Structures are given as structure tokens and as C-alpha cells.
Amino acid sequence: MGKEDVIRMEGTIIEALPNAMFRVELDNGHKVLAHVSGRMRKNFIRLVPGDRVIVELSVYDLTRGRIVYRKKPE
């Protein structure tokens, strides 16, 4: 999955699943299954339902993604 093969979208975590997987509802209403990126895991960034996140989706499978950023609460 190269940099040119990803779509970055913003969404909200709606459910925490086992093995660092999360169900994320994107701003357009779609629900995707997303895992935490390695850099977020390495830096111990905690995610809870309700957090706003940025998800990278592959153009080949739009139902799965990678959480790359947790937005700061406002």
C-alpha cells in the first residue's frame, strides 16, 4: 500500500474490538474496520470510543483501514 494508493478520511470511533481493532464511522456515514498504525502503538497512544481519528483506506478494499492520527478533543 504505497502513499499514492491510500485515501485519508476522518471519522469517529464507535466500537473497540479485540487485538487493537476498532469500528470507525466515517464522516460520509460508512463504517469501516480499522487497526492502529505501528507508530501509534509504539508511542502508546490510547484510543477510546468517541475519539475523532484520521483513517487511511486502501483503494483496493474500502471496508478496512489503518488509524494514523487521533485528533485533539476540542
Swiss-Prot record:
User: What's in the GO CC field?
Assistant: cytosol
Q: Name one GO molecular function term.
A: translation initiation factor activity
Annotated ranges, domain S1-like: 1-72
Location of this chain's protein in the cell: Cytoplasm
Q: Which UniProt keywords apply?
A: Cytoplasm, Initiation factor, Protein biosynthesis, RNA-binding, rRNA-binding
Q: Which domain of life is it from?
A: Bacteria
Q: What is its main location?
A: cytoplasm
Q: List the SUPFAM superfamilies.
A: Nucleic acid-binding proteins
Q: Which CDD domains match?
A: S1_IF1
Q: What does this protein do?
A: One of the essential components for the initiation of protein synthesis. Stabilizes the binding of IF-2 and IF-3 on the 30S subunit to which N-formylmethionyl-tRNA(fMet) subsequently binds. Helps modulate mRNA selection, yielding the 30S pre-initiation complex (PIC). Upon addition of the 50S ribosomal subunit IF-1, IF-2 and IF-3 are released leaving the mature 70S translation initiation complex.
Q: PANTHER family in the record, alphabetically?
A: TRANSLATION INITIATION FACTOR IF-1, CHLOROPLASTIC
Record family assignment: Belongs to the IF-1 family.
Q: How does it assemble?
A: Component of the 30S ribosomal translation pre-initiation complex which assembles on the 30S ribosome in the order IF-2 and IF-3, IF-1 and N-formylmethionyl-tRNA(fMet); mRNA recruitment can occur at any time during PIC assembly.
Q: What is the protein's name according to its record?
A: Translation initiation factor IF-1
What organism, scientifically named, is this protein from? Answer: Thermotoga petrophila (strain ATCC BAA-488 / DSM 13995 / JCM 10881 / RKU-1)
Organismal lineage: Bacteria, Thermotogati, Thermotogota, Thermotogae, Thermotogales
